[in-house]
Design a protein with these regions (language model features):
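Structural signal for conserved beta-strand scaffold positions within catalytic alpha/beta enzyme cores
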Residues: 87, 133-135, 224, 354, ...
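Conserved C-terminal alpha-helix-loop-beta "cap" of PLP-dependent enzymes
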Residues: 294-469
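Conserved PLP-enzyme active-site core in the AAT-like
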Residues: 11-16, 20, 64, 82, ...
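Short glycine-rich or small-residue beta-strand-to-loop segments that form or flank ligand, phosphate
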Residues: 59, 86-88, 166-169, 327, ...
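Active-site-proximal structural scaffolding
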Residues: 8, 215, 230, 263-266, ...
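Conserved N-terminal alpha-helix of the aminotransferase class I/II PLP-enzyme fold
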Residues: 49-94
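N-terminal "arm"/small-domain region of PLP-dependent enzymes with the aminotransferase-like
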Residues: 1-67
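Charge-dense polyanion-binding interfaces
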Residues: 466-484
């Protein structure tokens, strides 16, 4: 391998060489650098379609990288302080599932918080592993799930010494972090791997002012969404591995589910964004921290809103807080987070990341400007003035501890029947129900449907949350396990 530094972007450089070669394409894709689809070329631009190409010798192959993709992955591993990095083009969903499928199989136990992304539970459906849930605590005012308490994780390890792995969110969607170093040390002492969903933590590697990143904490694997806070294209992700993992086997697992037609647009975006973070990441992340701190102060000065931050830290369930997260509690305005989300989009042309029952998340990252923050703050102030309601009628919980009856795979593939949702109390759910975003299941296969959950679903629907998962997309019916 030639000498490479973080100033290089091997995939981008190879694509530039390919363009200069002026190859005549008798391969796929069929648009032939855009000539075969002028409408697409007009919409996306010739520069984009010029590099929407298939694998070839000079561009390497993601399924078996031996040249420029291998070099780009090496540079990414170096930038993120990992032993190896796998470029992923199926989103961090693919990275999370690869972590789990590489570590556990049918009947194996994996310790995890219940407030995981649906991709983690989907992986359990695929492999048949048994989740040992550590239910996170609830922040009483905000109603959101906290991190896993270290003692609770340790207790789960003691009860299930045969567990193969521990799965951790770092951070959660709301910015909350568990004590990842302590959990990792305890897990390794018990012979368990540590897998980290770091979808919302790419930026943690480029600041000393933020919570500890997974690789720095000694985790065995971490899935990072470069497209969320790293600046790459949507659907691009990186799977980081320590030298404790069998890399050849992990690569085989990835190739079971990942496409054989990897997009070079996505791969190049990962490569270029890694270079940008490696060279300018600390400066950029410092600027983001400052922008969010300013926004937090301004929003809290409006009244009724609560943009929360490091004051939540308790050294345990909230061991640390990601201060780039602009999470805003809206209940005191009498408006659900999803209502503020909708008003911002429909009346003010401001698109935030998500709104749920009582919280709103404005995702601030590498592309944001001070004037955008000012516009958001002004809109929130006007919404409070024009839309404020009696807050006493709002629901208070974002997270409900589930009653787990059987493992997700058994429930998902079991004989099932479809019932009107109002008739499902006490039955065992055989599918997912979730608000998306954030994609954390309200119900997962194998869990009992309770009054509290049904109330939450009805309220979320009424307030306009996008509920996904069930076969019946109208959410009038649910699939439940057939009673015997």
């Amino acid at each position: 391998m030639p000498y490479l530094s973080q100033t290089n972007a091997p995939i981008e450089e190879a694509l530039v060489r390919m363009k200069r070669a002026r190859l005549v394409p008798f391969d796929v894709p069929g648009h032939k650098r855009g000539r075969g689809n002028p409408e697409l070329a007009a919409f996306l631009g010739a520069a984009c379609l010029d590099v929407d190409v298939n694998s070839m010798k000079m561009l390497d192959n993601l399924c078996h990288p031996v040249s420029v993709i291998r070099d780009a992955e090496h540079l990414a591993a170096e930038a993120f302080r990992a032993a190896h990095a796998f470029f992923m083009v199926s989103g961090t969903t693919g990275s999370v599932q690869a972590m789990i499928l590489s570590t556990v199989g049918r009947g194996d136990k994996i310790i995890m918080p219940r407030n995981v992304h649906r991709s983690a539970i989907n992986a359990l459906i695929l492999c048949g592993a048994v989740p040992i849930y550590v239910n996170p605590g609830i922040e009483d005012t905000l109603g959101i799930a906290l991190g896993m308490r270290t003692d609770d994780v340790a207790a789960a390890m003691e009860r299930h010494p045969d567990a193969k792995a521990v799965f951790v969110n770092n951070p959660t969607y709301y910015g909350i972090c568990s004590d990842l170093r302590a959990i990792t040390e305890k897990a390794h002492a018990c012979g368990m791997k540590v897998l980290v969903d770091e979808a919302h933590g790419t930026h943690l590697y480029f600041s000393d002012r933020l919570p500890t990143a997974a690789m720095d904490a000694g985790a065995d694997m971490a899935a990072i969404s470069m497209h969320k806070s790293g600046g790459s294209l949507t659907q691009s992700s990186i799977l980081l591995c320590a030298d404790t993992m069998p890399l050849g086997y992990v690569h085989q697992i990835i190739n079971i589910t990942q496409t054989t037609s990897a997009s070079y647009l996505l791969l190049a975006s990962l490569d270029i964004s890694r270079r940008n973070l490696a060279l300018r990441g600390r400066e950029v992340i410092d600027r983001i921290i400052g922008l969010v701190a300013y926004a937090r102060d301004e929003i809290n000065a409006i009244g009724d809103y609560y943009a929360y931050g490091r004051e939540l830290i308790d050294g345990d369930a909230v061991y640390d807080f990601d201060t780039t997260k602009l999470s805003i509690f809206t209940r005191a305005t009498g408006l659900a987070g999803i209502e503020v989300y909708d008003i911002l989009r429909d009346d003010y042309d401001i698109q935030t990341e998500f709104g749920d029952i009582a919280n709103l998340l404005a995702y601030v990252s590498v592309g944001d400007r001070p004037k955008d923050i000012e516009r958001l703050v002004a809109a929130l102030a006007e919404i409070r003035r024009n839309y404020r309601k009696d807050p006493s009628k709002t629901l208070k919980m974002e997270y409900i501890d589930p009653v787990v009856v059987c493992v997700p795979q058994d429930a998902f593939y079991a004989e099932k029947e479809s019932l009107p949702i109002q008739e499902t109390k006490g039955r065992i759910c055989a599918e997912f129900v979730m608000c998306y975003p954030p994609g954390i299941p309200i119900l997962a296969p194998g869990e009992e449907i309770t009054d509290e959950i049904l109330t939450y679903i009805r309220y979320a629907k009424k307030k306009g949350c996008q509920i996904t998962g069930p076969e019946d997309m109208s959410i009038q019916r649910l699939n439940v396990m057939t009673e015997r």
